[in-house]
Amino acid sequence: MSSAVVMDLDSVPARAVLQALPQPVMVLDEARRIQFVNYAAEAFFGASLSVLTRQSLDDLIAFGSPIISLVETVVQRHAPMTEYRVRVGSSRFGDERIADVFASPISDTDGRVAVLIQERTMADKIDRQMVSRGAARSVTGLASMLAHEIKN
């Protein structure tokens, strides 16, 4: 029999746990204003906590992003939800990123939502490029076949 040491979770600050996560995490209020971001979110969005907490999600994420409607739905339903393969674009960083976005209401708060962003892997990006390349080859093949038929 082994003697397991059980850690007293009350002694661990929640902020330290959130800061230790490698994925970007944000806490939003009911108006989608940013209340907290962890270090990974600061790196992801290219801005500090003090800059980000002066903004709302609408300021940070491109207009019409499914992330905004995801957060609205989580607030309305009081239930966690996930969006997969979302394009995360912003004027703050140049390239669009593909990510899975997890949002959950924070219990015992008035409409606050925790949002975790998990960027998709390089393999997904390569897969998309291969699909595009295959489509381009199909179009090129079709064009050469039509040119041959017209010639005959």
For each predicted feature, which ranges?
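Hydrophobic pocket-lining residues within nucleotide cofactor-binding pockets
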Residues: 21, 28, 57, 106, ...
